[in-house]
């Protein structure tokens, strides 16, 4: 990814998180990122593609951060780590809620890519938690 595309993506993510998807237009993203509208549209054909790209980036970061935090923990210890990670996230000054829930809530039924990305993200989180919940006593009974 080029520096310009990365800057646009990072700026869009910050603005969407700070405000909302519907409140932030491409002109604001262009102005805040310091790129031209032509450059923005070179990398992202429309706002929906930009939103989808932001969600894909956020999903990768979310998964990596959560997996790293859980580390080698298993069973109940892993579930506790998952909750601890979320508590730390919720307590951050810039926390405004889940970007995926917000994107889905602000999208129309025609925004299938955005809705699918939000659904896939939540499904991954469900499966991630479920893998540790299958045998919750395994670790705690060995202590």
What are these regions (language model features)?
Residues 138-143:
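Hydrophobic alpha-helical segments that form the core
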Residues 77, 110-135:
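Amphipathic alpha-helical packing segments from all-alpha helical-bundle domains
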Residues 1-3:
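N-terminal intrinsically disordered/low-complexity leader segments
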Residues 53, 67-92:
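Hydrophobic alpha-helical connector segments
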Residues 51-58, 65:
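Alpha-helical DNA-contacting segments of helix-turn-helix folds
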Residues 92-113:
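Amphipathic alpha-helical segments used for helix-helix packing
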Residues 7, 11, 15-49, 53:
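Helix-turn-helix
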